[in-house]
Amino acid sequence: MTMVYANIFLAFITSLMGLLMYRSHLMSSLLCLEGMMLSLFVMMTITILNSHFTLASMTPIILLVFAACEAALGLSLLVMVSNTYGTDYVQNLNLLQC
């Protein structure tokens, strides 16, 4: 494993640990998810370019499309929750609350 792959893997693990540790606020969770998607995109792109596997060259672009959809849905959920409750706590997303 080269240093580039190790650094990208470390960025993914750091984002994952941030998602697990700071999951009380929705905004920090969304930022950690975006960091994970960005590191996955860079890892896939470098792997495909290094292996000269041209048939899978569209895969990172498809991942970016899904990341953009995830970001749009997450931000709309953040706006809805902050307008309704005034905060961005994840505990406000519990549907079993009265």
From Swiss-Prot:
Protein's GO biological process: ATP synthesis coupled electron transport
Record-listed E.C. numbers: 7.1.1.2
Membrane-spanning residues: 1-21, 29-49, 61-81
Cleaved signal peptide residues: none
A GO term, aspect molecular function: NADH dehydrogenase (ubiquinone) activity
GO CC field: mitochondrial inner membrane; respiratory chain complex I
InterPro entries xrefs: NADH_UbQ_OxRdtase_chain4L/K (IPR001133), NUOK/Mnh_C1-like (IPR039428)
Superkingdom assignment: Eukaryota
Membrane topology: Multi-pass membrane protein
Class of the enzyme per the UniProt entry, highest EC level: translocase
Coiled-coil stretches noted in the UniProt entry, renumbered to this chain: none
Catalytic activity, reaction form: a ubiquinone + NADH + 5 H(+)(in) = a ubiquinol + NAD(+) + 4 H(+)(out)
Compartmental location: Mitochondrion inner membrane
A Pfam family matched in the record: Oxidored_q2
Keyword terms of this UniProt record: Electron transport, Membrane, Mitochondrion, Mitochondrion inner membrane, NAD, Respiratory chain, Translocase, Transmembrane, Transmembrane helix, Transport, Ubiquinone
Family to which this protein belongs: Belongs to the complex I subunit 4L family.
Quaternary organization: Core subunit of respiratory chain NADH dehydrogenase (Complex I) which is composed of 45 different subunits.
Function (record text): Core subunit of the mitochondrial membrane respiratory chain NADH dehydrogenase (Complex I) which catalyzes electron transfer from NADH through the respiratory chain, using ubiquinone as an electron acceptor. Part of the enzyme membrane arm which is embedded in the lipid bilayer and involved in proton translocation.
Protein name: NADH-ubiquinone oxidoreductase chain 4L
Organism: Ommatophoca rossii (Ross seal)
